[in-house]
Amino acid sequence: DSYQLKQTDAFVYLGGTISRDGSESDVKRRIGLARGLFQSLNNIWIAKELSRETKVQVYETLVLGVLLYNSETWTLKVEQKNRLRVLEMTFLRKIEGVTRRDRIRNVDIYARLNYHRNINDRIRERRLRYFGHICRMGRERYPTIVLNGHVHGRRNRGRPKKRWLDVVKEDCEEMGINIHEATRGAMDRERWTTMLTEHPMRAQASPRL
């Protein structure tokens, strides 16, 4: 029997949102899920008997685990990066027990909590690790085919959408290497891990946010 497939603008597959707007819907959904989880753990954030270290560990394990799920596939716009950074600072200020009215700079919040990498650096590292994983796959694997494939036909008018590989190239530039060096380095898992460690991301947040 024939089965008619329903057309939709977005659907959830393996926990990630696949949509026409790229990463936008998935980012919004993840922000909503993470915010709800963070609020449900309020008793932990306000607990006087728990150390900063313990609270940060809970935050990184639970909240970031939800927020950053599937983030290695995201192609983020500047607006989305800013939204994620503001959300992160809202969370961290709550953990530290301060608000924006206290006029404490972001870098000082990071220092107090011994928190070394901002959320966009974490996403960048996850994306590069996933890029390395794809590079080590065989050419016949679907992720490799999609990464290296080209879509034939006319492009729509206007500025073309940024591809995932374009973002990876920008990530590599942040590390001070080019995409060709990254591709060669990624073929060796241990070497790629070392490269990511030796070329740390720019982890300082803007003190104005």
PLM region descriptions:
Residues 1-209:
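Short linear motifs embedded in intrinsically disordered, charge-biased segments
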